[in-house]
Structures are given as structure tokens and as C-alpha cells.
A protein has these predicted regions:
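Conserved N-terminal subdomain of the carbohydrate kinase-like
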Residues: 2-9, 29-105, 109-112
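Glycine/serine-rich anion-binding loops at beta->alpha junctions
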Residues: 7-29
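Glycine- and other small-residue-rich loops at beta-strand/loop junctions that grip anionic moieties
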Residues: 13, 79-80, 115, 176
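Glycine-rich anion/phosphate-binding loops
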Residues: 15-19, 82-93, 117-121
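Short glycine-enriched, charge-decorated loop/helix-capping segments at active-site entrances
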Residues: 49-56, 115-120, 149-153
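Juxtamembrane transmembrane-helix boundary motif
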Residues: 80, 94-122, 129, 133-142, ...
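Conserved phosphate/ATP/ADP-binding segment of small-molecule kinases
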Residues: 120-178
């Protein structure tokens, strides 16, 4: 990412600041760029786990994306937690209105404490429609296992899972160790 880039983050809010939109804002700002946000859910969480998840209405997610991008055209979009198929549909629809070549998807599915953050219908839609739009997909090991229906224990398993994600339609894959 070039300094002074404008990045739209579409993700959940983490009350502890360790993940989600808060972590993305810190990273983008530290790299000298400008962060904009569209919040998909508000979570009450800390380092020990997730207490609650409050979804933002789909229409408001769509409005946040389009209204922000109408004024400040993003150079890149980073997508995190999309908790339902309706949210994924709204994000796909909004992306069709925004011409951005750099789309990074971090398919947030499981919180560090183990709480599931996305339903099976949404996982299937993510695989069928959204992954192929991404410049880069960055699942962690548990997320890559869910997306590919494989078990990852060794580096070779990560490579196999990355190839399966490319078969699904991903352009580039970075499987994180977490």
C-alpha cells in the first residue's frame, strides 16, 4: 500500500481494539494511509473471548459503503467480518458500484476464543461469489480449513489449502498461522 492511499474497511467492530476495524485502522494509519469504515457488527469482546455480537442492519451497511465511497473514492477495500449471507449480498452489490482494483478479504469466521462469527449459508456465498472478486484472500488456518474442508497440520497442508482456494476462484492466497 502506498502512503496516502485511501482504504475502506468493511468489517466488525472489536471493543477491545485487538481485531476488526480497530486493528485495521491502526495498521492503515501506521502505514501512512487514510482509513474509512463501514461497520458490519459491533462485538463485545476481550482477549478471553466474545461476549456478544450485534449485527448492523444490512441497509445501513450498504449505505455506509456507498455514501463513504461517493465522497472519498477508496484506492483499496479490506473486508473482514461479514456475518450473514444478506450482508455478503449487500457488500457484493455495493462493490459493483465502486470501481476498486485492490480488494483484500480476510474471511473472519471464528474469533480467537473459538466463537463462530458466520453461518454456513454465508460461508457458501463467500466461496461462490465474493472470493473471486478479491485481489488477495487472507484466511487464518481455521478459516482456510472451513473454506476448503481440509485439515491443516503441516506446511504442505497449507499449500494444498491455498491451491484449493485458487480453484474456488481466489486470485492470491496468504494463509496466516493463527
Amino acid at each position: 500500500m502506498k502512503p496516502n492511499s485511501k482504504v475502506l474497511i468493511i468489517a466488525g467492530s472489536d471493543s477491545s481494539g485487538g481485531a476488526g476495524i480497530q486493528a485495521d485502522i491502526k495498521t492503515i494509519t501506521a502505514l501512512g494511509s487514510y482509513a474509512m469504515t463501514a461497520i458490519t457488527a459491533i462485538t463485545a469482546q476481550n482477549t478471553t473471548g466474545v461476549k456478544s455480537i450485534v449485527p448492523i442492519p444490512v441497509k445501513e451497511i450498504f449505505n455506509q459503503i456507498l455514501f463513504t465511497a461517493k465522497d472519498i473514492k477508496p484506492d483499496a477495500i479490506k473486508i473482514g467480518m461479514l456475518h450473514s449471507s444478506k450482508v455478503i449480498d449487500a457488500v457484493i452489490k455495493s462493490l459493483e458500484s465502486i470501481n476498486v482494483n485492490k480488494l483484500v478479504i480476510d474471511p473472519v469466521m471464528v474469533a480467537k476464543g473459538g466463537a463462530k462469527l458466520i453461518d454456513n449459508k454465508a460461508i457458501n456465498l463467500l466461496k461462490k461469489k465474493l472470493i473471486k472478486k478479491a485481489s488477495l484472500i487472507t484466511p487464518n488456518i481455521p478459516e482456510a480449513e472451513i473454506l476448503t474442508n481440509t485439515t491443516i497440520r503441516r506446511n504442505e497442508d497449507m499449500i494444498f489449502a491455498a491451491h484449493k482456494l485458487i480453484e474456488i476462484g481466489a486470485n492470491n492466497v496468504l494463509i496466516k498461522g493463527g
